[in-house]
Each structure stands twice: as C-alpha cells, then as structure tokens.
Amino acid sequence: MKIVVSGGGTGGHIYPALAFINEMKKRDERLDVLYIGTERGLESEIVPREGIPFQTIHITGFQRKLSMENVKTVVRFLRGTKRAKALLNEFKPDVVIGTGGYVCGPVVYAAAKLKIPTVIHEQNSVPGLTNKFLSRYVDRIAICFKEAEAFFPKNKVVFTGNPRASEVMSGNREEGLRSLGIKPNKKTVLIVGGSRGARPINDAFMSILSDVKAKPYQFVYVTGTVHYERVQEQMKSIGQPENVIVQPFIHNMPDVLSAVDLIVARAGATTLAEITALGLPSILIPSPYVTNNHQEKNAAALSKKDAAILRKESELTGDRLLEDIDDIMVTPGRLDAMKQAAKALGVPTAAEKLHMLVKEVAK
C-alpha cells in the first residue's frame, strides 16, 4: 500500500501523523510512505529523523483579518497545489491523509481533485480553518472529540480518537520512575507546560515552592528548555525542596506519564489523548493564545465529565494551583474517581481505528 501523509506546523499535527504511520507499518511491512510538509515547520526536523521520505511545498497560513498577506497566501496555495499534484502524480498513492496545519490544505485538495481517496484527521474539539475548508472535498473526516462533529458534514464523520493515545500505552512505569529518580512509594504530580514551557505555569509553581516541601507527595517539574536557566537561578535563592525533581524537558514522556498520579498541563489535543488513554487525572490550564480558543474547549470536554479541573490562565495563581492539587491528592476517593472518568474518555485503540478507516477509504 502507498500512502501520502501531510500535516505540520506544531507537534499536535505531526505526532499523531507519526503514530498513524507507525501503526500502518506494524500491519503492512511493505508500506510505502511519503510525508509532505513545509521546509520551515517542525515537521522538517522531526519526520526525516524518523527515516520517513519527506518532500516540501511552500505555503503559509491565512491571517484572520483582511490583509495583503492573505492575497500572497492564495497565490502560494495555488502554487502549492500545483507542486502537490506533481508529487502525487509521481508517487501515485492509494490514499492521502491530512492531519492538520495549513500545509495539508493544498496537498489534500490536490489529491481530491486528482480523484485520489482522502481522509483528514481533526485532533481538536473545534477544527481549524484548513480542515473546515477541506471537509467539502474529502471522503472521510476522523475526529477525536464528539464536539467536533457539529462542524463537518455528518455523513463523512467517523470517531477514531487520536493515534498518539495508542503509542502512550506502551509506556514503562519502572523506566519512568528510574529515569527521573521518582520515589515509587510516594504519589507524584507532574507539572509541564509543553516542550518550550509556559511562563504563567512556571511563575505560579515557583511562587509556592517553599510551601510544597511540606506536602506528602512529590513533584516532577518540567520547566521547558527556554525557561530552565531562569528557574535554576530562582531555585538557588529559594532552595530546591527534596520532593521536587526539576527537568528542562522529558524525552520519554510515555514512561513518565505511566509513573505519575496527576498532571498539570496545557490542554493541547495530543496531551489530552495521552492522559485519557492512561486514565490520568489532570489540572488543565489552556493556552489563551491558540486559534478559536480551542484548548479551553478541549479542556471543557474533560472537566464536564469530572476527569479534569479546568483553570483559566487569567485566574491562575500559585495558591489556587496548590488548592487544586491538594483537593485532588488529599480528598478521599477524588483521585480514583477522576482516574475512572478520564479512562472512560480515552481511546487507546485510536491508531487501529484510524488504520481501519484509511484502509476502507483506499479500496
């Protein structure tokens, strides 16, 4: 089978694509894959490193206000579509799947116009502009939140979940504990703001650093690479509590997620797919800087089922964060109830479901 995958810009579009490719490879040793991205997006670093053939097109996203830049974007879209058609005619795929980000716009559109079977995968509860546009042309639309169904033609929608949920199930708890020196006899709270970190989360946690040392549980605090040095300087003056492990970045996240009891994080779609698959309770602080405020809507899908506490960045303080953590960790039965609620929302078989859908469309 030959497939073209396109998606990029952020890890939220790239990692589900890679998880899907890995699932396809497990089931078909002769699978032939071509990944089409942009030369500047994160995918240009990540995808070739995975040993996947990679081609690029030049495209930029639309701005949400009228501007001359949007005129240039239309021209780039038309050129990108022409380039995509050339790549598709040369590779001759059985199916094309787009996982979001503006790069998949011209690729999936070109495939539809060439009568090649097409699927788009929408990770968020509120779709972005690209997937809304493509929904008119594709054969099937895979979604991860039931709330996303309202934005698409009903006859095309299939609920699959996010394939990253399947990958995280392979996490090794013992390796997670060992790699960071986490004490196995203590409950653990993971605080993370994404690969680059989130300053408001860092500031909130640092403001309560002297208070957390008395807590009966331990913390794994991931600052983000950008903020690590600044946090280390602050730690020197305040003093690092024995029950706080500080890291700039975590490379083995599936292992670490398997080893912790509660996570404080942003509400990106991939993060939520991972934590619900594992049944991991969460305090979610959505980024207010994303398109359509989709992280808050993602988080709301969990909080209304009591799988998470949704805490807006505008109302985040260190004291409020510690209250939320204590509420979950100390209240009898609360942690277990949230675990069950999170697990009920998880789709650990998401990669298999997406694989089956793509195979069906490719026939």
Curated annotation (Swiss-Prot):
Localisation per UniProt entry: Cell membrane
Keyword Transferase in annotation: yes
Pfam families: Glyco_tran_28_C, Glyco_transf_28
Membrane topology: Peripheral membrane protein
Biological pathway: Cell wall biogenesis; peptidoglycan biosynthesis
UniProt-listed InterPro entries: GlcNAc_MurG, Glyco_trans_28_C, GlycoTrans_28_N
Gene Ontology cellular component list: plasma membrane
CDD domains, alphabetized: GT28_MurG
SUPFAM superfamilies xref list: UDP-Glycosyltransferase/glycogen phosphorylase
GO MF terms held by the record: UDP-N-acetyl-D-glucosamine:N-acetylmuramoyl-L-alanyl-D-glutamyl-meso-2,6-diaminopimelyl-D-alanyl-D-alanine-diphosphoundecaprenol 4-beta-N-acetylglucosaminlytransferase activity; undecaprenyldiphospho-muramoylpentapeptide beta-N-acetylglucosaminyltransferase activity
Catalytic reaction list: di-trans,octa-cis-undecaprenyl diphospho-N-acetyl-alpha-D-muramoyl-L-alanyl-D-glutamyl-meso-2,6-diaminopimeloyl-D-alanyl-D-alanine + UDP-N-acetyl-alpha-D-glucosamine = di-trans,octa-cis-undecaprenyl diphospho-[N-acetyl-alpha-D-glucosaminyl-(1->4)]-N-acetyl-alpha-D-muramoyl-L-alanyl-D-glutamyl-meso-2,6-diaminopimeloyl-D-alanyl-D-alanine + UDP + H(+)
Binding residues for UDP-N-acetyl-alpha-D-glucosamine: 10-12, 124, 195, 250, 295
UniProt main location, coarse: membrane
A biological process from GO: cell division
EC class (word): transferase
EC nos: 2.4.1.227
Keywords: Cell cycle, Cell division, Cell membrane, Cell shape, Cell wall biogenesis/degradation, Glycosyltransferase, Membrane, Peptidoglycan synthesis, Transferase
Keyword Oxidoreductase: no
Purpose: Cell wall formation. Catalyzes the transfer of a GlcNAc subunit on undecaprenyl-pyrophosphoryl-MurNAc-pentapeptide (lipid intermediate I) to form undecaprenyl-pyrophosphoryl-MurNAc-(pentapeptide)GlcNAc (lipid intermediate II).
Protein family: Belongs to the glycosyltransferase 28 family. MurG subfamily.
PANTHER family: GLYCOSYLTRANSFERASE, UDP-N-ACETYLGLUCOSAMINE--N-ACETYLMURAMYL-(PENTAPEPTIDE) PYROPHOSPHORYL-UNDECAPRENOL N-ACETYLGLUCOSAMINE TRANSFERASE 1
Name by which UniProt lists this protein: UDP-N-acetylglucosamine--N-acetylmuramyl-(pentapeptide) pyrophosphoryl-undecaprenol N-acetylglucosamine transferase
Organism: Halalkalibacterium halodurans (strain ATCC BAA-125 / DSM 18197 / FERM 7344 / JCM 9153 / C-125)
